Amino acid sequence: MYLTAHSGSDQTPENSLAFANFFKDKKGIDVIEVDVRCNPQGELVLSHDALEKKEYVRLSELLLILEGTTIKLNCDLKEANLEQKVYQLAQKNNQWSQIYLSGNVSLNYLKNWPEQLLINLENFVGRQGRSPMWDEDDACEKLEWLGQQGARVINLSHLFYTERLARKGNELELSFSLWTVDDLADIRRYQDQGIFNVTTRRAMEYLNQQEVFR
C-alpha cells in the first residue's frame, strides 16, 4: 500500500514548502499531496481554494525540493485543463515519473498516462436526490465504464468505499485510492486489504504507531 501524506498532514502548513521539506525524506511516506491551480500569470501554484490577490507557493518551487528524492507527488488539480502544464513543468527536470494527477483530470489522458492518473469516481456519479451520498447502482455502472476507458486506479472518499464497490472493482481488476482516512485503525485495515493507496492527514502518526506495535 502507498501511504500519502495529505497536504497539511501532521499539523504542517497546507500547500507549503515546509510541508514538502518535512516529508520528502520520511521513510514509509510514499507520496505527498498538494492542491494545484493556475494563477493569472499562467504559473501553477498551490491552493485548495480559489485564488485571491496574494502570493502562493509555485509548483516549480516544490518540485525543486523533491528533486533527487524517491517520493512521489499527487497533484490534486482544482481546475480543468492543467494536465499538460503539470507534465511540461515536471518534464523540465525529468520528474514526470514522480507525478500522479487526481481531481479535475480528463479521461483523454488515460491513453498516455494510465498508471499516473487517479480517476475521481465522484466526478461521474449521480446523487440520491438531495442526499450527500451517491447512487451506488450508478457508481458500480460508472466504475465499469471507467475501466472500459482505460482507468487503472479509482480515487474516492473512503466513506463511499463499500463492499459492493470493492467487489466490483476486483472483478474489473481496478485498484482503489482512498481519501481522507484519518482513523488509524481504518488505515491499518485498508493496508491489510491491499488497497493501492490511502491518503491521510495523520501519516507520520500512523507510521509511529505501527513502529510501536512491532
Report residues per predicted region:
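Phosphate-group recognition and catalysis centered on beta-loop-alpha active-site segments
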Residues: M1-R214
